[in-house]
């Protein structure tokens, strides 16, 4: 980690807005080989596009079709028996993902499970952590959070008998800017902290790519 931090610091100190410098960084990129693992959209002339929308929808891995076809083939041949006898049995499928997921979140394999959809998981989380009362009932969220996140939050607010328009606080960027300033987030928390029951900010905003 320290080596990577030192390298990033060196890059920031020697940064140049030139094609040569960008090419040099590409050659030094230890992850560059993974580029070949994905399909990259092309323009009308067949040139690969520069894709900067991974925070919204990632590129398709080249192995995806083969993986999906394997499951469809097992379904066709095995039917319900696929739950136990497919190449990747469906019943314990989540166990195949726990180890890699644990590395991403920094937990133990026994502590991590892949389940449901994002929206369902948000509802499960808010059932536990959103406990509004008369004084403290507001939810703080990004103004441009993923639409289904907003739907889930509004649903929970209504479920507890409150009006979303009065209860949901949306963080917006300043006029002419694309990301929310940290100091603006802190200011809202200072001003509304006694009224806020839940703060829900995504790790990476799907629309702007801002990291929180």
Language-model-detected regions and their locations in the chain:
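Pyridoxal 5′-phosphate
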Residues: 2-212
């Amino acid at each position: 980690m320290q080596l990577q931090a030192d390298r990033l610091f060196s890059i920031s100190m020697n940064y140049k807005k030139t094609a040569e410098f960008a090419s040099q960084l590409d050659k030094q990129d230890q992850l560059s080989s993974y580029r070949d693992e994905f399909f990259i959209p092309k323009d009308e002339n067949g040139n690969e596009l520069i894709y900067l929308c991974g925070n919204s929808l990632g590129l398709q891995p080249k192995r995806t079709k083969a993986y999906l076809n394997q499951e469809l083939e097992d379904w066709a041949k095995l039917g319900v028996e696929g739950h136990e006898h497919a190449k990747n049995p469906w019943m314990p499928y989540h166990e195949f993902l726990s180890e890699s997921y644990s590395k991403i979140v920094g937990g133990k394999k026994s502590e991590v499970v892949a389940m449901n959809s994002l929206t369902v998981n948000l509802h499960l989380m808010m059932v536990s952590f959103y406990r509004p009362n008369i004084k403290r009932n507001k939810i703080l969220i990004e103004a441009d959070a993923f639409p289904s996140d907003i739907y889930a939050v509004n649903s929970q607010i209504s479920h507890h008998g409150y009006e979303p328009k009065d209860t949901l606080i949306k963080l917006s960027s300043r006029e002419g800017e694309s990301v929310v300033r940290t100091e603006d987030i802190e200011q809202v928390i200072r001003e509304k902290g006694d009224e806020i029951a839940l703060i829900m900010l995504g790790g990476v905003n799907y629309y702007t790519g801002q990291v929180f």
